[in-house]
């Protein structure tokens, strides 16, 4: 899969050859090619699937019974949510924010000293490392993390988690100055700008990590704050990321309160352009869609969270028809319950095909592009395809699992979308390093990470038994 060879091209017996953190060759494998690689590189090789790791002959280059893909690219998510899976279910977005997100992030902040002593590290780092495990488990090697709520104060921890995991990450740093938890309001709004300046100075040179503005919602950020954040984005040449029109009641409340939709509001302050990435964009008017199209803004669809929280689904077919670019992502583990990005792609298509009674909409090839090459282009990352010069980000999916048998060249992409359950990701390579090999994590201490998150989740449950109930977060405050 590459722009050069064709994003829908399938190769029966292919290979990818990497050096350091880049792909230097990709294409059809032949015995002659294998002999050349052995001759040129000798023991300076790591051959995935080989039984030995030195003194290679061409016979050691095995044909893995896997499907080789680009590493998946997640264009919207939250890395603090693993410990709140299953909390505050069967409720709408704003109730879930009250009952899960803000309770948990407030717990981490309020009990920070106690939790740090317990774990010997920042409790935020504990949960962010679990999010790295979640992504790698499902083959996600690059992401844009919307670092909202109390998390906006803990960027150093997420940068460290990304460094340890050897993944790529854009950190969209949150802000709020109205209609939100009083403890985290950025009043005066220069606090949000000062925070970005500080993070940019501290982390500008950190490899595989980028800082951008990530105001939480249009309803929670006033016009002067959004204008200042947009100026910062332009001055620094970055993207800017925001939730938009996600939940129907809040979207309707916003229009009643401010006399315009969130998109009309954004347009009125010149917030929207080709550098603007909108998460969700579920609830729209025809005028909203026309504004988005004209502005060049892009949309990230998160079907797992949108369905679980009852937010609705965006008009993807209309967006396609008028030329609004969109990709598919998972959102956070707390609202989506997992980071199975193949499931997200399947869920998006299932709904749209059924709703429009059009089985031809969102084919398997298109869906795969919307979790690889297209989000990589959205995020300006040098990944998402298998071709010379791209970052060495790859996923090997195990084709020996019963749900993926039979797989052939003509049905492999269809099987990945419709038959996989996410657990078939066998090996993951990111930036030239093997992160997961034959289902085993190679860089992260998997057992320690999952044990700490299990303990943290139990401590949160105890805390919630006596914690003050939070109400009115988001809208209607």
What are these regions (language model features)?
Residues 1-55, 471:
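N-terminal metal-binding scaffold of metallo-dependent hydrolase/deaminase domains
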Residues 155, 248-260, 288-293, 310-319, ...:
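Histidine/acidic-residue-rich catalytic or RNA/ligand-binding cores of hydrolases
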Residues 4, 391-450:
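C-terminal cap of metal-dependent C-N hydrolases
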Residues 67-68, 87-167, 194-205, 454-456:
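Alpha-helical scaffold segments that flank or form the walls of functional sites
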Residues 268-275, 317-403, 419:
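His/Asp/Glu-enriched, well-ordered alpha-helical/loop segment
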Residues 151-281, 285:
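Metal-coordinating catalytic core of metallo-dependent amide/deamination hydrolases
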